[in-house]
From Swiss-Prot:
Pfam families: Ycf4 (PF02392). This is Photosystem I assembly protein Ycf4. InterPro entries: PSI_Ycf4_assembly. Belongs to the Ycf4 family. It comes from Cucumis sativus (Cucumber). GO terms for cellular component: chloroplast thylakoid membrane; photosystem I. Disulfide bonds: none annotated. It is found in: Plastid, Chloroplast thylakoid membrane. The keyword Phosphoprotein does not apply. Seems to be required for the assembly of the photosystem I complex. GO terms for biological process: photosynthesis. Keywords: Chloroplast, Membrane, Photosynthesis, Plastid, Thylakoid, Transmembrane, Transmembrane helix.
Length: 184
C-alpha cells in the first residue's frame, strides 16, 4: 500500500511476513520434527512414527544423523518464525517535498538497532539508480544515491519487478524528487 499527494509520498514495505516465508517455516518445522522423531524412535527402540519401524533404522549412525538434522532444522525453523513474528524488513519510505526531507524506516532484529531510521535532506540526493543484472537469476534493484552516504536500496532484491515496473517506479520517484536517473 502506498500513499501519495502533491508534496508527500509514503511507500510502505511488507517485510518478512510473506506467504512464502510462512510456507517455508511450516514445511521446515514439520520436516525437522519428523527427522527428530525418527532419530529418537531409533534410540528408544519404540515406534514414535508408525511409518518407519524402529528396527529398520539403527541408532548409530543413521539415528544420530537424523537427530542432528532434526535439531538443526528446528533451529532454522525457529529463526524463520522469529523473523516473521518480528516482521524484520518492514517499514516505510517517506519523501516530503514540503520539508525537503527523506525518511527511511525499517524494523530490524530485537536489540539496540531494532528501529532503523535514516533521514536525509532532499538536496543531498544525487540520483535514483537502477541496477540490472540479467541471467538465470535476473535482479533489478532501485537505489537512491546520497551525497557522502553511498547508495541506499529502495526495493528488496527478492521483489522481482519487471523492467517496465522498475522503470516506471524510478521515473515517478525521480520526477517527484527532481533528480536524474542512472542505469547500471
Amino acid at each position: 500500500m502506498n500513499w501519495r499527494s502533491e508534496r508527500i509520498w509514503i511507500e510502505f514495505l511488507r517485510g518478512s511476513r510473506k506467504i512464502s516465508n510462512f510456507c517455508w517455516a511450516f514445511i521446515l518445522f514439520l520436516g525437522s520434527l519428523g527427522f527428530l522423531l525418527v532419530g529418537t524412535s531409533s534410540y528408544l527402540g519404540r515406534d514414535l512414527i508408525s511409518l518407519f519401524p524402529s528396527q529398520q533404522i539403527i541408532f548409530f549412525p543413521q539415528g544420530i544423523v537424523m537427530s542432528f538434522y532434526g535439531i538443526a532444522g528446528l533451529f532454522i525453523s525457529s529463526y524463520l518464525w522469529c523473523t516473521i513474528l518480528w516482521n524484520v524488513g518492514s517499514g516505510y519510505d517517506r519523501f516530503d517535498r514540503k520539508e525537503e526531507i527523506v525518511s527511511i524506516f525499517r524494523w530490524g532484529f530485537p536489540g539496540k538497532n531494532r528501529r532503523i531510521f535514516l533521514r536525509f535532506l532532499m538536496k543531498d540526493i544525487q540520483s535514483i539508480r537502477i541496477e540490472v543484472k540479467e541471467g538465470i537469476y535476473a535482479r533489478r534493484v532501485l537505489y537512491m544515491e546520497i551525497r557522502g552516504q553511498g547508495a541506499i536500496p529502495l526495493t528488496r532484491t527478492d521483489q522481482n519487478l519487471t523492467p517496465r515496473e522498475i522503470e516506471q517506479k524510478a521515473a515517478e520517484l525521480a520526477y517527484f524528487l527532481r533528480v536524474p536517473i542512472e542505469v547500471f
